[in-house]
Amino acid sequence: MNGGAPTKIANFLHKSIVSVLALTSLGCGVFVISATADLLERRKKRREEEDRIINEFIENDKKRILEENLRQQQQQQQK
């Protein structure tokens, strides 16, 4: 039982379709990994920016409190 041309054609089509599906899946996987890496990088940058803003706010608040305390001390000394 040789199988003949129809079997060879069917096998070729099957291998071709499986190869296309495998390459498509691989391409999708690469895209997902790339998109995930990009998302993680953007999150990291956003987190760094948030930390910078928070630290800047804290420093400004410390300066404001020190200035307010100094002003109060000066007012008390004037009395």
UniProtKB/Swiss-Prot annotation:
Record lineage: Eukaryota, Amoebozoa, Evosea, Eumycetozoa, Dictyostelia
Transmembrane segment boundaries: 15-37
Transmembrane helix recorded as keyword: yes
Membrane topology listed for this record: Single-pass membrane protein
Alphabetical keyword list: Membrane, Transmembrane, Transmembrane helix
Localisation per UniProt entry: Membrane
Keyword Transmembrane helix: yes
Any single Gene Ontology cellular-component annotation: membrane
Location, primary (coarse class): membrane
Organism: Dictyostelium discoideum (Social amoeba)
Protein name: Putative uncharacterized protein DDB_G0267482
